[in-house]
Regions:
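Sec-dependent N-terminal signal peptides
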Residues: 4-13
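Heptad-repeat register of long alpha-helical coiled-coils used for dimerization/oligomerization
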Residues: 24, 28-31, 38, 96, ...
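A glycine-/polar-enriched beta->alpha junction
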Residues: 32-42, 49-64, 90-108, 118-125, ...
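Periplasmic alpha-helical coiled-coil/stalk elements that build and connect Gram-negative outer-membrane
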Residues: 126-241
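Small/polar, glycine/serine/threonine/aspartate-rich low-complexity segments that form flexible
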Residues: 21-23, 69-96, 105, 221-231, ...
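Heptad-repeat amphipathic alpha-helical coiled-coil interaction surface used
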Residues: 43, 48-50, 55-57, 106-108, ...
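Bacterial Sec-pathway N-terminal export signals of envelope proteins
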Residues: 19-67, 170-172, 212-257
Length: 316
């Protein structure tokens, strides 16, 4: 008796430990796991970071550039020998105007950045939607399997009853066969639903990267899709909602605006550019070089550049 109680206690503890290792995972945690695990979300995020860098690069054109260069020059002359000079040059350049090229490039980068953000949110929504759909499919197939099992238990009890009735001569053998056919049909349905459940479980594990059991997924019975869905009857209101919330539409608009700014930048490049340039040169002559021939100098000027021909690049 003591040995029997020991085995029962051990089995109960083992079962409790196993149950504690398989907690029910909320839908929110499954969605977060999928957003972390799916490569498409990561790729979309890094594309957003790239577009942010492109925007910073476009904005950097608004700032002046400061350069420091050093060079060693050798000049051999027959009369005086070899002249050497170490030249240190600091130059400051600032583009005063380019007639809208930089502004158009910045606006283009902003539209592309907004596009990447919208695509990132769209990717997360797609992944979340797939997780939610799979989540409720798993719950649905579990309930269908449970219903089939309950019905099978009912027919099995009926089969036992008919066995007694046939033995006593009250019922016929054909009645028992009908019950057995019903049980076989339920077994077939159970196998089919189990296969569907396995497919959905594999899909959930592939999306989340988690090793899950069907018992860990239980839907909220209070969830009602049609109570939360907003039915829109007005075509104008529906179109307004599409223009405001639809990711594909917003991306299409931003792509068109970015292309327009690209065209504006190409048209503006037909105009000249005006730059303010300042430089300071420090010379350090040596050898047979004279200091008077290599004096330090400071220059300030305005450069106007106009492109005459670049192989039809702007028109292309």
């Amino acid at each position: 008796m003591k040995i029997k109680m020991f085995f029962l206690t051990t089995a109960f503890i083992t079962q409790s430990t196993y149950a504690s290792e398989l907690p029910v995972i909320p839908l929110r945690d499954l969605v977060n796991a999928a957003l972390t695990h799916q490569p498409s979300v990561a790729v979309s995020y890094y594309e957003t970071e790239k577009k942010n860098s492109d925007l910073d690069l476009s904005r950097a054109a608004l700032y002046p550039t400061l350069d420091l260069t050093s060079g060693l020059n050798n000049n051999r002359k027959e009369s005086s020998g070899t002249e050497r000079n170490v030249e240190n040059k600091v130059s400051l350049s600032y583009r005063i105007t380019d007639f809208g090229v930089r502004g158009a490039n910045i606006r283009k980068s902003e539209y592309e950045r907004d596009n990447s953000k919208t695509d990132y949110e769209k990717t997360k929504n797609i992944v979340s939607q797939e997780v939610v759909t799979t989540y409720y499919n798993i719950s649905k197939y579990r309930e269908m399997i449970d219903g089939v099992n309950l019905e099978k238990e009912f027919y099995k009890k009926m089969l036992e009853t008919f066995s007694l009735l046939v033995s006593s001569g009250v019922a016929m053998q054909s009645d028992m066969r009908k019950v057995q056919v019903s049980i076989d049909a339920l077994n077939t349905r159970s196998i089919m639903y189990q296969s569907m459940l396995d497919d959905e479980m594999y899909k959930m594990q592939n999306m989340t990267g988690l090793n899950l059991s069907p018992d860990q997924i239980q839907s909220d019975e209070k969830f009602n899709l049609f109570k939360k869905y907003i039915f829109v009857e007005s075509p104008e209101k529906l179109m307004d909602m599409v223009m405001k919330y639809n990711d594909d539409y917003k991306m299409l608009v931003n792509t068109r605006k970015a292309a327009t700014e690209d065209i504006n930048a190409a048209k503006s490049s037909y105009f000249p550019t005006v730059d303010l340039v300042s430089s300071y040169v420090q010379n350090n002559p040596s050898g047979s070089a004279k200091k008077s021939d290599y004096e330090d100098e400071f220059k300030t000027g305005i450069n106007v550049s106009f492109n005459i021909f670049n192989g039809f690049r702007n028109s292309a």
